Structure formats: C-alpha cells, structure tokens
Swiss-Prot record:
Keywords: Calcium, Copper, Disulfide bond, Glycoprotein, Metal-binding, Oxidoreductase, Secreted, Signal, TPQ. Residues 1-16 form the signal peptide. Ca(2+) 1 binds at D528, L529, D530, D672, L673. The lineage of its organism: Eukaryota, Metazoa, Chordata, Craniata, Vertebrata. It comes from Bos taurus (Bovine). This is Primary amine oxidase, lung isozyme. It catalyses: a primary methyl amine + O2 + H2O = an aldehyde + H2O2 + NH4(+). Substrate binds at residues 383-393, 467-472.
C-alpha cells in the first residue's frame, strides 16, 4: 500500500545538514545513519531519460538525432540558397520549423491493436521561400525517419493552394530589424518630447517594444502596432507603458522600405514622429511625464520579506507508482503517450484506463486573448497563440513551484528558427498527487456502524507556456475513477495601456497612468474519444418537470422530475453556441451496453465562463470561429486535423483554417467522432493583478467522466480504499492499511538537488 505523507521539508533540511546537507555531495547517496531514518525508495528524474523513439512510440516527439537528420536532408534537397532562420530576412529562404508529422489514425491503430507494421515515422517542415519570384510558404513531409529519403509537398493538398507569403510567422530577426528601425531611425526624430515624457536618450536602452496582432485590417496587410514601455530590469515591463504606440508597415521584403504609418501618443494620433515633435516644440502637446522607477516598486516579483518555514512536501514512502519511459506514462490504472506540438502545445494519445482505450487523442489546439481599450494597440489585439507557438514558448518547469519537488521531469527537443536542434530541459512534469479530498466516503452510525472510503489520488501531466506576458499552466489530470480532467490556469503579467480619457470603460486603473486592459482568454481542445471502439453515438440528456396526477390521490397534481433523452443525429444538432443553451448531460456512447442495459458512455462536462464570443460580423472572427461553440461534435477526418493554424494570426481575414467549415451537417450516428471543446473566461484586471495575476479563480477546462461505462464505481477495486466496521480494531494494519502509516513512512525522501532548466534562447 502506497501512502502520500505531508512533511515539513524544514525538518528534513535540518536533519540533512547534520550529514552534509540534503542534496549536498556528502548527503546524497547516504542510505542510513544511526540518527537518521532510511531513505525512501525513489527514482531520480535523471533515471527517466528521453529515449530514442522506437516503433512502439508512434507519438513521441522527434529526437535530436531525427531533427538533425531532417535538417541535413532538407538542406541537401533545397539547395544552397537556404539561410539560417535565426538570421533570415523576409527576402531569404529558410526552414522555419521541423516537428513530428502525426501518423494516420487507421495505421496507428492497426499497429497498436493488430500488430501491423508501424506507419512510417515522418516529420513536418515549414519552409519560408522569401527569395523565390513568387514568395510563398510551403509545408513538406519528410521521411522515413531516422534516415529520410523522400520529401513531399503537401501545401496544396492541405490548404487548397499555395500559402501567401504575408501569412508567414514573424521571425525573431524581423522583430530585431523592426526594433532597429524604431530605435535607430525613428525615435531620434522625436527626441525632445520623448526625453520630456520618458527620460529618453538615443541608445540609452530605457525603452522596449511590445508587439500586437493581427498585423493590419485586411488580407495582405503586414502593419503592426508596437507599444513602447519602460525597460524595467528583472521585472515585467508590461506594466509600464509610456503612452507611445507606432504603426509599423513591414510588408516589404527589404527592411529599408519599412515605414511608420501612424503615431499614437498619450491620447492623440499623429501622422509621423516628426509631426509629434513639431507640435511638441510648438507647445501644442500636453505631455504626461511618466516616471521611470527602475527595479523597485510593487511590480517586482522579488519578495520583500525573508523566507519563512518551508511549505509542506508530498513524497513517496514506498517509491513512485508510475513510470515514464520515453514518451509513455504507465501507472497501475492509466497509460498514455505525451508530446508537445511546436505551435499547438501539449497533447496526449492512446489514453487507456485499466488497459482499455478511452481516447485516441486529447490535444490543445489554440489559445486566444481578445483585448479592448482606447489605445490602438489595445483595441486591435487578438492574440492567437498557436502562431507564436505554445510549444515553442514552453518554459522550463521550476522544481517545487511549477510542479511538486519530487515530480518526474522530462526534456523536449525542438527545431524552430534554427539550423540545429535545441533542448528545453524540464519541459514536462508527471506526478501523483494526494488531493487532500476523499474520492468517495461514507460514515454510517444508523442501523449499522462502519466507515468506507478512498483518498483522491490523481496522476498529473503538466507543461507551461509563456506567451509574452502571460503564463499558461496546461494540465491533464487522471482520476482513479476513470475520469480525465483537462484544464488550464493563467498567471503572469497583465497587459496594460496608457491611462487617459474614457479608459475606465476598458478596465481598471492599476498604477499611475496605467490601465489594466479588459480581455478574454479562450482555449480550444480536440477530444477524439473512442468509447468502446470507433463507432460512437451522441446522446443529450437533461431534466424536465412534468405535471402528473398523483396516482393514489387523483384530485391532486404534482410536478414530477423526469429525464429527457435525445440521440443527436447530425453535426448541426451537436454544435452548441457559446452563451446559448446546451444539455447538461452530453455524452458519446458505444453500441455496447453495460450490465444494466445502458450504452457505455463518456460524458463531456465543461467548466467554463467564456461568455459571449467575438461577433460573427467581425472581420477576424472566421480565424477563431471555433469560439462560436462551447462544444461541437463532428465526424473525425484526417483532413481536419486541427481547428486552427499557425498562419491564421497573420491573415485572420482569410483564415487558412476556418473551424466552422468542419460543421456541415454530416451524420454523427455510429461514426468515429471528435468533440471540440472551448473553455475560457473574462478577465477585467484589477489592483490584485499587480504584479502578477494569480491562478486562483483563473482556471477553466472540462471533465471526461464515465457515464454507464462501467457496471459500478471502478475505484471499488482500488488498493487505496479502506473499510472497517464496529467491533473491528481500526488501528490494526490487517484491518486498515492507513494504520500501517508509522511503519510505511519511517523514511526520509531522497530529495534531488534543486534545478532549473535555464532561460532558452529563441
């Protein structure tokens, strides 16, 4: 019997110091001492290496060796005109990204279930051809790995035609060239007003830019508003707008031809920085002086109080109850494979409970933040984070903060905007967690006396993405009753704007001259459930009060509660608009029945406060048309792998993927189905968001819960459950496993040295 124990780590550290200190060279490796308890059985995260993906790991992200092989092959095939994406200008040809090309589902299942040969392992490369007569974006499938011999252009096949070049993602070099243009060429033209308001000195480095998106107002545009902020060292500059925003047209392939189209300064618009400076010199600009307070103040994340007693620690008295081998997680109840899409973020595959597959894929697709405000940058912004890359901007997980100290940490290899692969250390964590809550329990002292229950212990898979100012904590949680919980929390810095005029219509003032801008957060998920097989049906259930004559007293009438059931036949019937009505029970069911004659099913239960979607008459709405629906169920198709695209951000007016096209009223009866789930919330920033937004109350998601899938509650077979009745000695190990705690937990956790994955270079 495994038991989680809460201990004060402080005690362990004091004990460890007597023997060289916990995590010190002397302390590590000592197994026993007359004055110390023995070390608990454990496995260091270093014992969980990222192995080379073999044929059994169909969904494992590409290894460093595979990434290198693909890059070498493409470099050879595409010729000498390729430029390192890290240095590429818009007029260059470069390989933007290489990642795993997911295998077709039919081929994957044939291998997993029927031992057919595994499908070819392939990579997907995105190439920017800025140096061709007709600049374009091309998608290439490369295989087979690990020794590629072919590449296949799939751009037309997937997108119906070539991808216009203006849809390509803004490379880091492009941002650097924009900064060089702004700081070296443009700002000196308004040196007087900027020195007066913002302590500006040419080359002084006290200002930084922050991008917005989308870049313009119609297809073909590539004109982006950039806000300027104080460069606050070792703290979030996002809270320090100076009131200057610049509209940069960077569509030309030659950076020398880029221009400033419009200037916004502290509530007024100007044609150029020259005009702003002229009006300032003429005394026609009312300048608000923005103090530069350096690193001090409430916006720093460095605590102003000394450390206190160490928080509680969860550890494993009898060793971990799960294993991570390559990309596969295995516990006594659950197995699944995990990965990280470079743009779409965390994803899991082949999810099984007690050996039976429940879902083929559960994956994040897109995350969107829509802002409002009375400055141009604030009012225009609709961030579509798949464009920036929710895998690309995954961050190292900090031991003991992002995940429990003793979690298992796994690295991720990627090739993005570079000629060589890189490694993000501690990109994922997997851990088992005592929720401090009974999964089920009952105490009876009526008629008979007994107690039975089981603690809620969950298995968690986690990653974190930091997109500019915001940090997204992505969780997939596996419960012992067969339920899966998918959720995300938001933390980090809010985005802010210069406070003027009617600013309070768009948020709250959070510091002097600073508006915390109102915005929404939404995420979209793909849920490919296979409930008892590939053929599934969609059922909706709710309740109604029905007037009923009382059988034994016909002169009286009551309102009787009853269940209303309906099988949904088409995709239109199973698409539920955000903000509209929806059945409180919606589940996918098999043609199989449980012991009681009900179809075995899995219910989708959303926990979301997304509110109203972007109106459909908005010019950018089609790029995020998935936001129209809180839930939609469609036929699964290989031609509809994702609800969004990395290219939607830079051309939302003619989106590369329009999710609404997936819903075309096809039958969903007895088909392989995918549920698409939206979760989100409204955020009106307030004083308590300074310096950081907290995760409390800022988490949403959904549950996948068994609904007549089993014959009874599956945790009845849990080895963690306890039961004792009147007359039994509840303090006996033979009766109650928890009574064995003093013996089972007489060990000290073998704590690894604190580590942090560093600060990746993008």
């Amino acid at each position: 019997m495994f038991i989680f124990i809460f201990l004060s780590l402080w005690t362990l550290l004091v004990m460890g110091r007597e023997e060289g200190g916990v995590g010190s060279e002397e302390g590590v490796g000592k197994q026993c001492h007359p004055s110390l308890p023995p070390r608990c059985p454990s496995r260091s995260p270093s014992d969980q290496p990222w192995t080379h993906p073999d044929q059994s790991q169909l969904f494992a992200d590409l290894s460093r060796e595979e990434l290198t092989a693909v890059m070498s092959f493409l470099t050879q095939k595409l010729g000498p005109d390729l430029v390192d994406a890290a240095q590429a200008r818009p007029s260059d040809n470069c390989i933007f990204s290489v990642e795993l090309q997911l295998p077709p589902k039919a081929a994957a299942l044939a291998h997993l279930d029927r031992r057919s040969p595994p499908p070819a392992r392939e990579a997907l490369a995105i190439v920017f051809f800025g140096g061709q007569p007709q600049p374009n974006v091309t998608e290439l499938v490369v295989g087979p790995l690990p020794q590629p011999s072919y590449m296949r252009d799939v751009t037309v096949e997937r997108h119906g035609g070539p991808l216009p070049y203006y849809r390509h993602t803004v490379l880091l070099r492009e941002y650097l060239d924009i900064d060089q243009m702004i700081f070296n060429r443009e700002l000196p033209q308004a040196a007087g007003v900027l020195h007066h308001c913002c302590s500006y000195k040419q080359g002084g480095g006290n200002l930084v830019t922050m991008t917005t998106a989308p870049p313009g107002l119609q297809s073909g545009d590539r004109a982006t508003w950039f806000g300027l902020y104080y460069n606050i060292s070792k703290a979030g500059y996002y809270l320090h707008p100076v009131g200057l925003e610049l509209l940069v047209d960077h569509k030309a392939l030659d950076p020398a031809q880029w221009t400033i189209q419009k200037v916004f300064f502290q509530g007024r618009y100007y044609e150029s920085l020259v005009q702003l400076e002229e009006q300032f010199e003429a005394g026609r600009v009312n300048v608000v002086v923005i103090p530069n307070n350096g690193t001090g103040g409430s916006w720093s994340l460095k605590s102003q109080v000394p450390p206190g007693p160490t928080p509680p620690l969860q550890f494993h008295p009898q060793g971990t109850r799960f294993s991570v081998q390559g990309s596969r997680v295995t516990s006594s109840l659950w197995t699944f494979s995990f990965g990280l899409g470079a743009f779409s973020g965390p994803r899991i595959f082949d999810i099984r409970f007690q050996g039976e597959r429940l879902a083929y894929e559960i994956s994040l697709q897109e995350a969107v933040a829509i802002y409002g405000g009375n400055t141009p940058a604030a009012m225009l912004t609709r961030y579509m984070d798949a464009c920036f890359g929710m895998g690309k901007f995954a961050t190292p997980l900090t031991r003991g903060v992002d995940c429990p100290y003793l979690a298992t940490y796994v690295d991720w290899h990627f090739l993005l905007e570079s000629q060589a692969p890189k490694t993000l250390h501690d990109a994922f964590c997997v851990f088992e967690q005592n929720k401090g809550l009974p999964l089920r329990r009952h105490h009876s002292d009526f008629i008979s006396q007994y107690f039975g229950g089981v603690v809620e212990t969950v298995l968690v898979f986690r990653s974190v993405s930091t997109l500019l100012n915001y940090d997204y904590v992505w969780d997939m949680v596996f419960h012992p009753n067969g339920a899966i919980e998918v959720k995300f929390h938001v933390t980090g810095y809010i985005s802010s704007a210069f406070f003027f005029g009617t600013a309070q219509k768009y948020g709250n003032q959070v510091r002097e001259n600073t508006l915390g801008t109102v915005h929404t957060h939404s995420a979209h998920y793909k849920v490919d459930l296979d409930v008892g097989g590939l053929e599934n049906w969609v059922w909706a259930e709710d309740m109604a009060f029905v007037p009923t004559t009382v059988p034994w007293s016909p002169e009286h009438q009551i309102q009787r509660l009853q269940v209303i059931r309906k099988q949904l036949e088409t995709e239109e019937q199973a698409a539920f608009p955000l903000g509209g009505g929806s059945p409180r029970y919606l589940y996918l069911a098999s043609k199989q029945s449980n012991k009681w004659g009900h179809p075995r099913g899995y219910r989708i239960q959303t926990v979301s406060f997304a509110g109203r979607p972007l109106p459909q008459n908005s010019s950018t709405e089609r790029a995020i048309s998935w936001g129209r629906y809180q839930l939609a169920v469609t036929q699964r198709k290989e031609t509809e792998p994702s609800s969004s695209s990395v290219f939607n951000q830079n051309d939302p007016w003619t989106p590369t993927v329009d999710f609404a096209d997936f819903i075309n009223n096809e039958t969903i009866a007895g088909k392989d189905l995918v549920a698409w789930v939206t979760a989100g919330f409204l955020h009106i920033p307030h004083a308590e968001d300074i310096p950081n937004t907290v995760t409390v109350g800022n988490g949403v998601g959904f549950f996948l819960r068994p609904y007549n899938f089993f014959d009874q509650e599956p945790s009845m077979d849990s080895a963690d459950s306890i039961y004792f009745r009147e007359g039994q000695d509840a303090g006996s190990c033979e009766i109650n496993p928890l009574a064995c705690l003093p013996q089972a937990a007489t060990c000290a956790p073998d704590l690894p040295v604190f580590s942090h994955g560093g600060y990746p270079e993008y």
